[in-house]
Amino acid sequence: MSRFEMNQIKGVIPAMMTFFDREENVDTECTRRMVEFMLEHGADGFYLTGSTGECFTMTVEERNLVVDTVIDQVKGRMPVVVHVGDIGTKKSIELAEHAYRAGADAISSVPPFYWKFRAGDIYNYYRDISESTPLPMVVYNIQLAGLMDMDLLLQLAGLPNVHGLKYTARSHDEMGFIKETLGPDFMIYSGCDEMAFSGMCSGADGIIGSFYNLFPDLYKQILKKVEESDIKGGMRLQRIADEVIFAALKYDFPSVLHNLMNWRGLE
């Protein structure tokens, strides 16, 4: 079973990049070094093999290696959420079962994509994956995979193992409504790095994002401003983060993120 309960998975959670060597193999040494860097700079957990982790360009073996390496390095100090989404349900279940055996604290998945799926198909996908392990499931709502509407999200929240939502969209009014409707035991994570402050003010329990690889400590300060009800201070810090984000997003993602990590001397 997981070491952390869902209500303990909160705060600043980097959607961890996957680090490769020059031969395009997973660089486990760099991965371990990055885990320590992020923990030292305020990370409250890790979200593995998601969009930022380039999961859809990786083999099952590569994804599992990242999971094994990070969980071994973390050694139970912080919660680890593993994204197991894939274009096929069977492969997603295989990834979920591995995450459970490896010691992950929760699993997550984007909805099925490429073809146009009906709400019932998406519901069945999440049902099958969430039932494949005892781990809590975090539904991942993101434009790239096709945003799910509120009715479907509320339906998915009724599945026994679904206990959270990663909401990567700018309509924070909807996110806040979902949190208010489902109550404090259902965890909401804001997924827009450029709107982390807004997300937390709208009721999110934590933030999961790409740029927290670079400066988790800055986002830790943003969350502190939310706790202190310091609106001006929080907005000021968010603007600092946004300057980097908006400049970076003029270039190809996620390669620009790797270049920024190199620029900081981290990768």
Where do the language-model regions lie?
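An extracytoplasmic/periplasmic, membrane-proximal ligand-sensing/linker region
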Residues: L260-L266
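C-terminal substrate-binding/catalytic lobe of Rossmann-fold NAD(P)-dependent oxidoreductases
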Residues: K250-S255, M261
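Catalytic alpha/beta core domains of metabolic enzymes, predominantly
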Residues: D128-S132, Q143-Y251
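Secondary-structure boundary/capping positions in well-ordered alpha/beta enzyme cores
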Residues: R77-M78, P136, H163, D185, ...
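Interdomain hinge/lid region at the active-site interface
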Residues: F253, L266-E267
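Structural signal for well-ordered, non-membrane alpha-helices
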Residues: I71, D242-F246, H258
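Active-site beta->alpha loop and helix N-cap motifs at the rims of alpha/beta catalytic domains
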Residues: S2-P14, F19-L147
